[in-house]
């Protein structure tokens, strides 16, 4: 796009966000910097991106009729999926029937909505290195898969996110519990799972890869630590060998070129020495990439907004996005039931080069990420410690 109108006028450039969490909120803010009219949709009211959008809608995005009705009503110029729980076949049909523009493409949204589509594309079509794996539907298939890939292994529903339904099976004593959890933790309820062989990796990274009008660009690699399959800390840059970085970029380019379109992709990789294995890819900003709010001249959200609008991202012809030095993020978690209230915010921000984002989640029921602390320092270890200290200073209460 080279022309932008005025929001809430007939000339407006309209973008529909399908998913309105904390990542969508940051994308909405970046889009509005260019005068884009942002419409936010999700399955619950007052989601974070809804709080900054021009207007919002609550609907079941897995309902094809409801999704079609929303798109027909809003007539967006761009549809930007921000979560996996969307009836992506509807997006594919609308792209084919009406030329509706889906970011990065409707096919990419469909392939990445579950682990099977993207794993088969990576391993079987593109022949990228991955862990050994089996897809299973029944307990018998599940047990046979464990025998084939070996123990330890990882069991995940094909449709889940943020570690829901995911288990690391370390002995045969874990077999029944891992299956039961996978059948209750997925987005679609009981159903198909992937059993993945365990890779003895040194570390795992997210390589934020931007496809844009000027080519493909890469952010510095992001290291991260997960617990129960969910992001807890991330840092940038992750030290790695030149050979491993080069191979990571080759794998990232292969998978993102195949998915096509413009936008930012979060490519997850396992690394051991100079060896690299593909794990997963998200065709949108990644939670581990929250660190880029302080680590880069353009955050992952700014890069995504610029790329999908056809604007320069500041690193043409395959260049690397400018990095601000060792940086880290630490997730803020709330447990229980109620509306989150934060205390000691000033104490959390006491140290220089420390920042905070509170997501505005309207409610916590069980376990939820409600914010993130961010820090820069002279080393990765110092930045991680500073982010942890800031997180520990905050008090989170849940009010009825």
Curated annotation (Swiss-Prot):
InterPro entries: ATP-grasp (IPR011761), ATP-grasp_carboxylate-amine (IPR003135), ATP_grasp_subdomain_1 (IPR013815), PreATP-grasp_dom_sf (IPR016185), PurT (IPR005862), PurT/PurK_preATP-grasp (IPR054350), PurT_C (IPR048740), Rudment_hybrid_motif (IPR011054). Pathway: Purine metabolism; IMP biosynthesis via de novo pathway; N(2)-formyl-N(1)-(5-phospho-D-ribosyl)glycinamide from N(1)-(5-phospho-D-ribosyl)glycinamide (formate route): step 1/1. Residues 120-309 form the ATP-grasp domain. Keywords: ATP-binding, Ligase, Magnesium, Metal-binding, Nucleotide-binding, Purine biosynthesis. It is an enzyme of class 6 (ligase). One of its GO terms (biological process) is 'de novo' IMP biosynthetic process. N(1)-(5-phospho-beta-D-ribosyl)glycinamide binds at residues 22-23, 82, 287, 361, 368-369. GO terms for molecular function: ATP binding; magnesium ion binding; phosphoribosylglycinamide formyltransferase 2 activity; phosphoribosylglycinamide formyltransferase activity. ATP binds at residues 115, 156, 161-166, 196-199, 204. NCBIfam families: PRK09288.1, purT. Belongs to the PurK/PurT family. Homodimer. This is Formate-dependent phosphoribosylglycinamide formyltransferase. It comes from Xanthomonas euvesicatoria pv. vesicatoria (strain 85-10) (Xanthomonas campestris pv. vesicatoria). The gene is purT.
